[in-house]
Amino acid sequence: MASPMEAVARSSLVLAPRRRRALGLLPAAAAPFVLDCRRRHNGGMRRPHVSFACSAELDTGRRQLPSTGTRAVMSSCPGYVEGRMVGENTSQINMGREARIRRHLENPEFLPSSYDIAWVAMVPLPGTDHLQAPCFPECVEWILQNQHSNGSWGVNEFDSSASKDILLSTLACIIALEKWNVGSEQIRRGLHFIAKNFSIVIDDQIAAPIGFNLTFPAMVNLAIKMGLEFPASEISIDQILHLRDMELKRLSGEESLGKEAYFAYIAEGLEESMVDWSEVMKFQGKNGSLFNSPAATAAALVHRYDDKALGYLYSVVNKFGGEVPTVYPLNIFSQLSMVDTLVNIGISRHFSSDIKRILDKTYILWSQRDEEVMLDLPTCAMAFRLLRMNGYGVSSDDLSHVAEASTFHNSVEGYLDDTKSLLELYKASKVSLSENEPILEKMGCWSGSLLKEKLCSDDIRGTPILGEVEYALKFPFYATLEPLDHKWNIENFDARAYQKIKTKNMPCHVNEDLLALAAEDFSFCQSTYQNEIQHLESWEKENKLDQLEFTRKNLINSYLSAAATISPYELSDARIACAKSIALTLVADDFFDVGSSKEEQENLISLVEKWDQYHKVEFYSENVKAVFFALYSTVNQLGAMASAVQNRDVTKYNVESWLDYLRSLATDAEWQRSKYVPTMEEYMKNSIVTFALGPTILIALYFMGQNLWEDIVKNAEYDELFRLMNTCGRLQNDIQSFERECKDGKLNSVSLLVLDSKDVMSVEEAKEAINESISSCRRELLRLVVREDGVIPKSCKEMFWNLYKTSHVFYSQADGFSSPKEMMGAMNGVIFEPLKTRGN
């Protein structure tokens, strides 16, 4: 069975010849302007680097990155120049978006937190009476200058409606102003806002910040004690205090480190009698803060002086002035989250150098076991996953502090049952590179169980993270197709999303840029894919492959495999080369399986052995002739293009890989005819070649933008990547095609394993053993792919990993090329269905 392959994207092969002629882009005999381009850029009539160099589409606004050999030629072609002019305005907009994203990657910016600013404003100048002077007058000034027109303070970026978060921030700002006896008008308007929206406080259907049922009542009491005329009836205040009492009652039945951490985290909003500040200060970090929270640290200073805490607040105010954020420092978590988002929505390749700088810095902090990385659970988990997937040498032993569920439950995140932290730990556990990583195994076990429990409860129902949890549990990172993954993430991306801590923590407008850039990038990919399919359909007709009665109609599935493996639009040559090669391997597979006699099979192999001397061999039948000429013309065309890109002849290597493939198919056919039962070793040696990775992946690698040395196919690293991927794909195919092949009287690894055991092993046990082998090969494959000290270029190694993921998805339910309904559904989603974003 041939391999399901992805490809690469964006190239000169995108338009079918007839369509190119219709658009005036590439006449059959080459229009004068094409010939002129060739003369200018290639010296007279010498062959250009790529066959259809001037067939670029009109620019739709996104900056195009044509295949390597195409760019110089395209620059003076009329179609290209016109397209560039049409898209100039959009390109400028995109450049602005990218610039803002880069700035945020380098130095994350978040909107000021009114709540935290208010608490920092309450800190008195050391050595003075508490009522004399603020230590940070710039924070007091910020409060005076930044009240909203409705009387509130807080983040209300997208609407002006009240929320518990805004009410909490407004009350904190009122208390800060009252403490320093300033802003009487602002206080009056703030109290009016609270009075108008007071019903929100006791509405349990409205989302609340962490600890709200404790902090808001405590601050109401504080306001009353300060002499403020609180704008609520005695009954309403009693209801608020009842909320606090119910929350305290709920918490009173347990004693744990997690509870202590939680109380310390929200200490600024607790009643004085409830707080032991000496216990709270046990959670002070090396930077002097409590949980990197300006509000909690400021509250500690209000109640007891501490040099380190004061130093922390000075560092915050020195950096931000009066615009204090709700968490600081947050750079690493924010930067890693942004990197993860860029990967998930498919635009990380546009920011590769920025991402490398962030990961280099993160790796240094990881090696130093820096608190900002190691002690924050979601940051630690995300750092491990991203560093490992990008080739940094991080050991799973460094996660020993989160190997057990008890560690999670004893943290603030665990005590709050934070789904995001749990999800990050689960994702990190799946990035295993060997069978001997028990920490990851334990972590994955308990985090996965807790996430499944959440799905069965109402905890996260109706929240955006519900979909993320369902997706992560259903599709491990090695079981997703990049284009489908990108589409799902873009459609579920919320540009208004914020981190809900004690108050909103919202990035400064960058989410809108991310969504716009990703949506346009994906739409451009779709347009490219659609043009490539038209080209492939024309190619199929020109080679009369659609007239072969013995072969399956597999062109769409072949292209889907290629697009799933090589998804960026700028790698079109690689993707089309891959798709054509897959389609041809399936034709050959069907030819040897059901469409030919032994004589015809031998005839086809003889013709390929002669290749350019094929006229010395007679065609045994019309089917042989059709298959050979389709193979001959396509391999030569792709070989000529690849040779131009690589500056040497590479066609011979592709022909050799085809010969190996056809000979292995012939061996398999001979076993079928003679009823020979091979040993497992014989079967695997032959069948991993019939998985067809050789003829499909090598030709695509030549178009990946890397100069590959002549003997790459003889390199040990290439050979091992090839072996591991072929083994995984073959075993995956065998498991899912077992029942069908049994009915056809064919053997595969499942049936051979059962036979070798003399029927002691059941079919299900054999499948389980093979699945274990697949898992082992997958881990070893990933280890080779992410390893930085190899000689194979990273982009080429990643193609093997992407191919594994494609194979896994294709064979997770059934033999991928026998499931047209499922594959067409996926194809429609990636190629034809428009994005359905949240309307941000």
From Swiss-Prot:
Residues 1-56 form a transit peptide. One of its GO terms (cellular component) is chloroplast. Its EC number is 4.2.3.35. Mg(2+) 2 binds at residues 589, 593. The keyword S-adenosyl-L-methionine does not apply. Induction: Induced by methyl jasmonate (MeJa) and UV irradiation. Its main location: plastid. A motif (DDXXD motif) lies at residues 589-593. 9-beta-pimara-7,15-diene is a precursor of the phytoalexins momilactones A and B. Phytoalexins are diterpenoid secondary metabolites involved in the defense mechanism of the plant and produced in response to attack (by a pathogen, elicitor or UV irradiation). Momilactone B can also act as an allochemical (an antimicrobial and allelopathic agent), being constitutively produced in the root of the plant and secreted to the rhizosphere where it suppresses the growth of neighboring plants and soil microorganisms. This is 9-beta-pimara-7,15-diene synthase, chloroplastic.
